[in-house]
């Protein structure tokens, strides 16, 4: 499969991962989707555009090209569930609202899915591993920011309205607690926005697997409510008027992340 990811190598010890930004579909997935899924409603819409300042900041960036409807890059390759209750797996079978993703009998075959694992999932995770190792080798530490977004109202997954900024550190296991406090502080000072640490979204496979403070790799997931930068209904339009103030907070978060790293490791 061609062009399964995009990658930009930066100049600072920060890697931003965008595993759910992809829009491409395999033929088998496209042919099998129910009508409600054809607009790719569960995409982390416009995340590369929202973080377009990150390259100038000096971050490395890796982003998926294929949709999570093909394979979910934020799930382990053994498909072990990450959350209790309603969730989606390595090969999603349902939409976030709970309806079937594929028409009866038209889900991709086991052989097709094995191809997705080998040709999409493994290259993405290989890129993550190599870049984190390179950053740690060069700087003595590495910072991983797993960038996500989701609709603010999904009754099948969570009650009520999701906070705007949902920070996840796998209950403190994926990064230094002082770093988590710093990031919470940035969110608390952001007027007009709500936030939570380790609420409904505590960090998926990427945060849990790569975050290893004892080995000087600190990982944080941000699940951003899409209402902070776009229309949450079709055609899922990017709203510059909403996005600009949200980008200010995102930049402050990444700058706080980098400042903490430089202070902690005296670099």
UniProtKB/Swiss-Prot annotation:
Monomer. It catalyses: N-formyl-L-glutamate + H2O = formate + L-glutamate. Pfam families: FGase. This is N-formylglutamate deformylase. NCBIfam families: hutG_amidohyd (TIGR02017). Its EC number is 3.5.1.68. Belongs to the N-formylglutamate deformylase family.
């Amino acid at each position: 499969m061609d062009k399964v990811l995009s990658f930009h190598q930066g100049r600072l010890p920060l890697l931003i991962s965008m595993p759910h930004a992809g829009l491409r579909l395999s033929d088998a997935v496209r042919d099998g989707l129910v009508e409600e899924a054809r607009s790719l409603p569960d995409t982390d819409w416009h995340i590369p555009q929202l973080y377009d300042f990150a390259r100038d900041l000096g971050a490395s960036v890796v982003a998926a090209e294929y949709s999570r409807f093909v394979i979910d890059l934020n799930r382990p390759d053994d498909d072990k569930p990450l959350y209790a209750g309603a969730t989606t797996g390595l090969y999603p079978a349902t939409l976030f609202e709970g309806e079937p993703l594929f028409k009866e009998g038209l889900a991709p075959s086991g052989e097709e899915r094995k191809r997705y694992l080998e040709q999409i999932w493994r290259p993405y995770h290989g890129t993550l591993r190599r870049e984190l190792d390179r950053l740690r080798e060069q700087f003595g530490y590495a910072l991983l920011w797993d960038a996500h977004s989701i609709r603010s109202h999904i009754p099948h997954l969570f009650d009520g309205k999701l906070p705007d900024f949902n920070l996840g550190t796998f209950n403190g296991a994926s990064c230094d607690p002082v770093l988590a406090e710093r990031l919470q502080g940035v969110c608390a000072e952001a007027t007009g926005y709500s936030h939570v640490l380790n609420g409904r979204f505590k960090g998926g496979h990427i945060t849990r697997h790569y975050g290893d403070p004892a080995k000087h790799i600190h990982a944080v997931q941000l699940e951003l409510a899409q209402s902070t930068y776009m229309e949450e209904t079709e055609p899922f339009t990017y709203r510059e008027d909403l996005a600009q103030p949200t980008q200010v907070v995102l930049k402050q978060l990444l700058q706080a992340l980098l400042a903490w790293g430089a202070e902690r490791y005296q670099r």
